[in-house]
Each structure stands twice: as C-alpha cells, then as structure tokens.
C-alpha cells in the first residue's frame, strides 16, 4: 500500500484558491443592538461591535441615527428625527451604509429637510441619484485657481471685495446687520445669467437655513419667489425647532446637492445661514455624547467640522469638467467681536470676509459693510477689466475719507484739499448704499463707481446722490443704451466709453434738479477779467535798520 504524502505546496495552493473564491454572505449575519439610553436627541446602543463610524443605524420605529462615538461595549448615536418614541430595550439594526441624500435637477425650486425630503407640499421629488454626505473634497490637482467673477449685484462687494466662482467668502457681523440680505441679493442677481440659457453663465443656488425661525425661512422663500429666483434655487431648511442632529447635518446636505452639480461641470452658489448655529448644535450633541469639552465648551474637532465642509467649495480643473461651488458662509458675532473661537476658525478657513457693522447699519449705511477691514484674498483675479479700471482710486479715497473724518471730528480747520477729499468721500459712501433686493447689473455698477471716483458727482448735493444715480442710469438705459451694452459685452472700459459717458453725464446734469431747486450744469463758466478791470495795489515795505 502506497504511503499518502501531502506536500506543503498543495496545501498552500488549496488555501489560496479557497480564499480567492470566498464571498462572505452579508445577509447571513445581521447584527442587532439594544438601546441602553435615549434622550435629548442622542441614544446609546450596545451589541453592535462591527458598526462603522458615521454608519447609518435604524431604530424599531424606522427613525435613523448616525453612529458617532465607537466605544468599548456601546455606541453613541445622534438621532435624526423624533427621539421621543425611542425607549430603552428597543432593538437597533445596522444598515451597512453611510448617510446619503437624493440629488439632481429635480431639487431646483424645492424646499427640503436635512434628509432631502420635501417639506413644501409640492409632492415627492423624483430622482434616482444619491450622494453621500461625508465625501472627500476635491484634491489639489483637481482644482484650478479662482479666476471667474461671480457678480453679487452689490456695489461695495463687487468693487472692493470681489467674489470669484469657487471662492469661500465669509459674511460676518452682529445679528440684524443685513447678512442674510446680502446673500439673498446675490442669489437674486443670478437671474439674468439663468435666463440667458448659457450653461457657462448659469448659476444654481442653494440656501441652507440652520437654526433660523420658521417665519424667517418662509420670508426668504417668499422674497426669492417674488424675484423669480426660486426657479434655480434649492432651500435646505433646518429651523430652530429641529433636533440638534438635523442642524448638524443640514450644511452637509446642501453641499452634497451642490457637489453633484459641480462635478457635472455646472456652477453652484451655496449660502450657509449660519454656521454659528451649526457649531452650537454640534457642541450640544458632543456634550451629550460626553466628549471632552475644549475652548468655549466646543469639542476639539469643531475646526474640522467647518474645514471639511468649506473645503468642498472649489473651482475644478478643466479635466474635471471646470465646474465650481462658491460658498458664502455666515457667522454671527456678539458685539462685533471677531476674535471669538468660531469666527476666528472660519476666517482662517475662508478666502476673505465681508464684515458688517451694527454702527454703520444704525447710521443708515446699508449694506452696512465696513470696507476698511473687509477683504478678498482672491482680489482682482475675480474682477472684470471694466471694474478693475474704475475702482483703482475708490479704496484709497474711502481710506483717506475715514482718516480725515476722524481728524475733522475734533473741529480742526482743514485746508481746501482736505475739505474736497471729505466732500468726495461722503459722496462715495452715499454711492455705495443700495436698497434690499435690488442688485445692480455689472455695467451699471461700473458706471456708478466711475462717476463717483472721477469727480462727476462733486457738484451733486450728498442728499441727492442716490436719486441722481438712479435717474442717470435710467437716462442711460433710455438714451444711451449702447454704452451699457459695450461694457456688458466686452467687460472692458475704454477711453471711448469714458468720453461717451462724460458727454452723457454733462447732458443729463442740465435736466437734473436738486432738492433745493437748482439745475445742475446751468451755471455760466467763469470768464477771465480784462487787464483793465484788475486793480493793481502797490505795497510799500518800510526798511528797518538792523541792530
């Protein structure tokens, strides 16, 4: 009888074939956990040893939750929805998935909750595509520098702190200073681009409301509908009555919807209103999950909370489709303190900030933008040639005006040049004012700023500046529309355009009546006196002998 010999090579090959052909049956083993604690929007679950971080869990009543704290023996879960029906002893099931939301063009014109479910009463949203909330942002090699302007329609921003497609521009200020109004104006200003039908010009907009009053969100929606802007806008609403978990994920839901369009080569604008309330919701959740508190009781990863969100805003390279996601995060300060924890975090993440001051707001300067400390780190790269040419002296003129204004407050006598700078500065500040929900087209912004910086408004009384501006622009649209067309189409401002505007403004001044009844441009020019009309006085100087 021959001996049975087993060679090691055969055993190794057999094991290798078995490993390569093995396919685990996920359905064969389903983990079931048990709720050990529930309350205040969180739950603790035991018995799910294989659960992953940020995995979606499902409770008995169908409510979903996100696995956050993976501890020995139990998991800390953020409940997404009503937690009142979750009780100790109930079962919890793993889904094997991370949180995702439906995406697609069907979301345009709709109002949804942080899970992507419609809440506007217009029926279900028909879409087949989904996108995960926690996806990696575009890498360095997938991006390109910001170079295309995104017009806000607000003169102070487009001229002094320009925003480009793919930029993150922080809107920061105290409560009730017009932060939301600035962002809504920017959304409304995209209407002309949307109606053009040009995919390279069209901008889809997303407004994420975190912790706002329900009436405030309804007011924003009404304003957008009245302006015809809801056609290209999606609202993700997580009002103050929502659980902390919803407020925490709402900005990620909005960015997931926007990223879907960005990676299709489209342009997107997203407004986060506001990230202060998201940070507070995340702090509440973290403290309930017993995470160690840090500065101002925020958890240690609150910087990562915002950085991973805002890094998703990008201008993609041509190879990736050249789409863009522009972010306008809003941060609320207390007593204009920008050195607090969350404001400094977001300032360091973003590409610039627009600072709104309550003092300026109360003085009637609206939008209440402090142009001195507002900055755009993208700068002129996100401006048209026309705007670059006319704003050169605007920032310097405003800076000199602020310095002289502080000096003149002491009652000191000023020379003629300083008085002229003060007069022009007051007119420039008046020129930067504009009404809410009334954004300016780019060509009209250029004309207004050109008129102010070149001295054509120096003879217009300060109280008549805004009326002069609106009537002059209406006159141009009516009588000299070609000038505006040239600026809009070429995005440049040449000498011929400047000459044509100079002639037009001189003609218009002859018809403009100031509030005191004076017609501008009707004063006869001063003529030189004849030599015989000039009296000559002889001054005798007495000589004194020196000692």
From Swiss-Prot:
| Signal peptide per UniProt | none
List, alphabetically, the GO terms of the cellular component aspect: plasma membrane; proton-transporting ATP synthase complex
Q: Where does ATP bind?
A: 173-180
InterPro entries from the xrefs? ATP_synth_asu-like_sf, ATP_synth_asu_C, ATP_synth_asu_C_sf, ATP_synth_F1_a_nt-bd_dom, ATP_synth_F1_asu, ATPase_a/bsu_AS, ATPase_F1/V1/A1_a/bsu_N, ATPase_F1/V1/A1_a/bsu_N_sf
Q: Where in the cell is it found?
A: Cell membrane
The site feature described as Required for activity is recorded at 374
The protein's UniProt keywords, in alphabetical order, are: ATP synthesis, ATP-binding, Cell membrane, CF(1), Hydrogen ion transport, Ion transport, Membrane, Nucleotide-binding, Translocase, Transport
Q: Which cysteines are joined by disulfide bonds?
A: none
What is the purpose of this protein?
A: Produces ATP from ADP in the presence of a proton gradient across the membrane. The alpha chain is a regulatory subunit.
Put simply, this protein is called: ATP synthase subunit alpha
Species whose genome carries this gene: Thermobifida fusca (strain YX)
Its ancestry begins with: Bacteria, Bacillati, Actinomycetota, Actinomycetes, Streptosporangiales
Provide the gene name from the record.
atpA
């Amino acid at each position: 009888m021959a001996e049975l010999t087993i060679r090691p090579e055969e055993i190794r090959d057999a094991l290798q074939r078995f490993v390569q052909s093995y396919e685990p049956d996920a359905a064969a083993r389903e983990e079931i956990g048990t709720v050990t604690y529930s309350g205040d929007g969180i739950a603790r679950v035991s018995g799910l040893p294989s659960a992953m971080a940020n995995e979606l869990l499902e409770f008995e009543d169908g409510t979903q939750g996100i696995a956050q704290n993976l501890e020995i023996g139990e998991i800390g879960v953020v409940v997404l929805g009503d937690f009142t029906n979750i009780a100790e002893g109930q079962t919890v099931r793993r889904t094997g998935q991370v949180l995702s939301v439906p995406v697609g063009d069907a979301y345009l014109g709709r109002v949804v909750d942080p899970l992507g479910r419609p809440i506007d009463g217009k029926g279900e949203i028909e879409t087949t595509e989904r996108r995960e909330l926690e996806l990696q942002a575009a890498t360095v090699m997938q991006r390109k520098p910001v170079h295309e302007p995104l017009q806000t329609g607000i003169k102070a921003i487009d001229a002094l702190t320009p925003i480009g497609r793919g930029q993150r521009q922080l809107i920061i200020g105290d409560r009730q200073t017009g932060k939301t109004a600035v962002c809504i104006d920017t959304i409304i200003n995209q209407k002309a681009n949307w109606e053009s039908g040009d995919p390279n010009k069209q901008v889809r907009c997303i407004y994420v409301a975190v912790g706002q009053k329900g009436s405030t969100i309804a007011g924003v929606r009404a304003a957008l509908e009245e302006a015809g802007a809801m056609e290209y806008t999606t609202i993700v609403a997580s009002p103050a009555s929502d659980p902390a978990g919803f407020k925490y994920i709402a900005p990620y839901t909005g960015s997931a919807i926007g990223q879907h369009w960005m990676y299709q080569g489209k342009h997107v604008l997203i407004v986060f209103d506001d990230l202060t309330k998201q940070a507070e919701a995340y702090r509440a959740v973290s403290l309930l999950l017993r995470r160690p508190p840090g500065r101002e009781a925020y958890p240690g990863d609150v910087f990562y909370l915002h950085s991973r969100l805002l890094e998703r805003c990008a201008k993609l390279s041509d190879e990736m489709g050249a789409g863009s996601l522009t972010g306008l995060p809003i941060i609320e300060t207390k007593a204009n303190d920008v050195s607090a924890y969350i404001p400094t975090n977001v300032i360091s993440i973003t590409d610039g900030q627009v600072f709104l001051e309550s003092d300026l707001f109360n003085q009637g300067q609206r939008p209440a933008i402090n142009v001195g400390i507002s900055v755009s780190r993208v700068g002129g790269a996100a401006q048209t040639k026309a705007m670059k040419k006319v704003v050169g002296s605007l920032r310097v003129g405003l800076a000199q005006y602020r310095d002289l204004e502080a000096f003149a407050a002491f009652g000191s006598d000023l020379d003629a040049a300083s008085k002229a700078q003060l007069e022009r500065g007051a007119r420039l500040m008046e020129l930067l004012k504009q009404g809410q929900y009334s954004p300016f087209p780019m060509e009209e912004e250029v004309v207004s700023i050109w008129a102010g910086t070149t001295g054509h408004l120096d003879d217009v009384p300060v109280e008549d500046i805004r009326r002069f501006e609106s009537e002059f622009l209406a006159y141009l649209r009516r009588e000299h529309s070609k000038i505006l067309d040239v600026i809009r189409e070429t995005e440049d401002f040449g000498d011929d355009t400047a000459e044509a505007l100079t002639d037009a403004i001189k003609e218009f001044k002859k018809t403009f009546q100031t509030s005191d009844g004076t017609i501008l441009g009707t004063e006869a020019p001063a003529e030189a006196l004849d030599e015989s009309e000039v009296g000559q006085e002889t001054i005798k100087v007495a000589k004194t002998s020196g000692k």
